[in-house]
Amino acid sequence: VPATTVETSAIQAPSKEAPALSQVQAENTEVPAVAAGYFRLHLKTLPAGDIANLGLWIWDDVEQPSANWPAGALSLKDAQNDDYGYYIDIKLSEKQQKKISWLINDKVSGQNLTGDKNVELLAPAMNEAWVDEEFNSHTYPPLEKGFVRINYRNADDNYDNLTAWLFDDVKEPSKDWPKGAANKTGIGPYGAYWDVPLKDAAKLLGFVLLDQSKTGDDMKIQPNDYKFQDLEHHTQVFVHDKDPKVYNNPYYIDQVVLKGAEQTEETEIKATFSTLAGVTKEELQKGLTVKDKDGQEVTIT
């Protein structure tokens, strides 16, 4: 059986206004900035029970991992409030800042109320995460179900004349190209944004960003349709400049990473990825190269 290797490479009508979410969803009340060296964990809700008994147990890349179970957990009665819910700031380790693991416990009974959770720190700039009602973490404030927010940032922060042409599983696909494209909902921390109502059980979001001050193909911010296929797990998506990729985080990090590969049959390789959420077979194949023992590329089917 030859040895193989796998590599990663890595039309006229008034414009329609994009609908706005509630003020709480659209923009948080001002709170103090996250101090350097700290990470802010936002919690939408807390487990049932007396808050005086609830604790946040932390480990991995934090300055002081929790000790003395269960009473040694950080008391959640000291958590602060904002429009999202609660938040608590955690001092990070100076040695390594890749992952924070946590759980909420009952500091009296010792019950683990959430199960073990973790937050992957995708980029050095990442200093916040938002935990939803099911205690799943997000790199952005999750929005109400039935909506997705498209965020677009460009290098000069100029968002004049920008509109979004919407299609696929949106409740109201755009009509009358190009004037029927949706105006932006507003400007937020991740640039211009559009709040888009979705069909029930929506899976696929398609959109094109247009500069209405231009004409023809020059209107398009970039020539390809934007596509996003993981609406089940994400309520905000992020694009920037002329990059055609749609990201599920505001740090524009591609989270599809090849973790390992092994040859299991003469013509078969089993590959393990960090996630395949929202990735098509075609997209995956584009990013993979398989070579035989002589360094010749092998066709992937």
Regions found by a protein language model. Name each.
Residues 1-17:
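Sec-dependent, cleavable N-terminal signal peptides
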Residues 62-75, 110-116, 170-181, 215-222, ...:
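Surface-exposed loop/edge segments in extracytoplasmic proteins
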Residues 52-65, 160-177, 267-300:
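Short, surface-exposed alpha-helix to beta-strand junction/turn motifs within ectodomains of secreted
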Residues 14, 19-49, 80, 91-156, ...:
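The feature marks proteins involved in alpha-glucan
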Residues 34-35, 77-84, 144-145, 184-190, ...:
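Short, ordered beta-strand-loop transition motifs
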Residues 83-95, 191-199, 205-206, 252-301:
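Non-catalytic beta-sheet/beta-sandwich ligand-binding modules that flank or precede catalytic cores
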Residues 60, 82, 106, 132, ...:
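Acidic surface patches and DE-rich sequence motifs
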